[in-house]
Amino acid sequence: MYKYKKVRRISSNLIEDANRRYIVSLDNHVELMEALAAFCKDLTVYCGQVRGIGAISEATFRMYDPATKQYVDKTFSEQMEITNLTGNVSQKDKLPFLHVHATCSREDYSCVGGHLLSARVNGACELLVDEFGDTFAGREFDEETGLYLYKF
Ligand code: FE
């Protein structure tokens, strides 16, 4: 589903074993969020950040309306470049919980983007995952917003 390599040193200020950085290459045709979740679970990444670029054939974004607390999903089924993917990893129900946003460019160079639900890799997907191994970041349902917010 993916290949990865651990970056040997992030900076001289960080404790190498507690804070880990990985270069991750997702396999072609996998579903991005599923593969990233599998990576985080396999490598026990429960607190971290993710960034990346890649090429995909389909993406589904989710828009949340805070007024109605309803989700509206929209799928774009076309070849696109992930011009930027940014997200974080926390822990919910003892599993890695991903919160990822992405901007994707289309054939005409216009962009679509938002909160990423799923994407199908078609070409390559190259990610950098930073784990903050000694930090706990959970998730808790928040009545006011209707979202699972950070619980520290
Ligand atoms: Fe979001």
Where are these regions (language model features)?
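N-terminal intrinsically disordered, cationic/polar leader segments
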Residues: 1-98, 103-152
